[in-house]
């Protein structure tokens, strides 16, 4: 099957969770024999990443569209994709619960992929759909944790102010802040805070992390929580609908405004017994989130919407 993506950004140039969602899914598609191309609006130099062909901006947009059996898109490229593609099925990956009227208006052509069951409940579309949480290769992200308390993406919505307040209140703890790929990054100089630039390989961050903080105002899933749990790193987070479904009972939930509660949970994890217990729960939850079965089911869904025959004897590995 020929699969085409029409989106704005793609790894390794982008480290956004939505773009890594696309790449992890594409790695699976390649592993089971599909051909995958990614068409970026501003890309002038083609490259190949894990078997995924990222093509240069075409002179004629119709050529890659004619090649494809199905076209994937997400976020702000959705209206443009629907306008460009008239006779092929479109798969729209839903990364948030903001309403996309273009998707509703094209309910017969556009298939919806929700990133969580909770998101589907919050904003239901009449389109044919599938629920596929962000696929994370658990083995790839498994590292030996370090000794920092970490926040990834230092913007206000991700909880940068909470992060710095905790660092001020806990001067004997080491904090690690990692700049994100989007949003205004809030950088403050504190003696116990180290700031890193945006990382191309986020595993280097997890190698230095003992506790991951996610004091987010909004998360429809929260991919970094899954990545951290793969290494048994406890996640202290806000109780958003996405993080609750993602972390399950392994998450340590705090109200974003209750700073003292965050301090208490961090202090609790300083105990060896408490940390080991939380780490085991995190690893267990990560194992439950292995995407292999869901990806196989999703591939059958794609065969269904493209009216292609599904081969039950092919390779089923995701990597």
Per-range role (PLM):
Residues 17, 257, 273-303, 310-314, ...:
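A charged, aromatic-enriched C-terminal amphipathic alpha-helix characteristic of glycosyltransferases
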Residues 109-141, 157:
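Donor nucleotide-sugar binding/catalytic pocket of nucleotide-sugar-dependent glycosyltransferases
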Residues 203, 226-230, 241-245:
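Short alpha-helical segment that forms part of, or immediately flanks, the ligand-binding pocket
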Residues 154, 251-259, 268-273:
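Conserved acidic donor-binding segment of nucleotide-sugar-dependent glycosyltransferases
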Residues 138-189, 195:
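Conserved catalytic-core segment of nucleotide-activated headgroup transferases in glycan assembly
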Residues 234-237:
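Short hydrophobic beta-strand element within catalytic cores of glycosyltransferases
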């Amino acid at each position: 099957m020929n699969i085409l993506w029409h989106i704005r950004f793609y790894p390794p140039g982008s480290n956004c969770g939505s773009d890594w969602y696309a790449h992890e899914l594409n790695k699976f598609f390649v592993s089971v024999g599909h051909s995958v191309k990614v068409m970026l609006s501003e890309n002038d130099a083609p490259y190949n990443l894990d078997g995924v062909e990222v093509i240069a901006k075409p002179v004629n947009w119709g050529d890659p569209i004619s090649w494809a059996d199905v076209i994937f898109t997400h976020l702000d490229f959705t209206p443009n994709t629907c306008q460009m593609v008239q006779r092929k099925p479109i798969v729209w990956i839903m990364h948030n619960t903001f309403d996309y009227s273009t998707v509703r208006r094209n309910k017969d052509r556009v298939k919806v992929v929700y990133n969580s069951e909770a998101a589907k409940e919050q904003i239901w579309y009449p389109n044919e759909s599938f629920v596929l949480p962000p696929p994370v290769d658990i083995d790839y992200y498994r590292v030996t944790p370090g000794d920092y308390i970490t926040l990834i993406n230092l913007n206000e919505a991700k909880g940068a102010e909470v992060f710095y307040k905790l660092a001020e209140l806990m001067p004997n703890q080491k904090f690690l802040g990692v700049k994100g790929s989007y949003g205004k990054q809030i950088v403050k100089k504190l003696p116990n805070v180290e700031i890193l630039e945006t990382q191309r390989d986020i595993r280097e961050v997890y190698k230095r992390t003992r506790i991951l903080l996610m004091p987010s105002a909004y998360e429809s899933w929260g991919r970094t929580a899954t990545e951290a749990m793969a290494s048994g790193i406890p996640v202290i987070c806000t109780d958003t609908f996405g993080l609750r479904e993602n972390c399950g009972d392994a998450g340590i939930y705090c109200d974003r405004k209750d700073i003292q509660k965050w301090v208490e949970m961090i202090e609790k994890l300083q105990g060896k017994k408490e940390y080991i217990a939380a780490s085991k729960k995190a690893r267990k939850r990560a194992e439950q989130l292995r995407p292999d079965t869901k990806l196989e089911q999703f591939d059958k869904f794609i065969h269904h919407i493209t009216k292609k025959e599904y081969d039950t004897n092919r390779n089923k590995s995701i990597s």
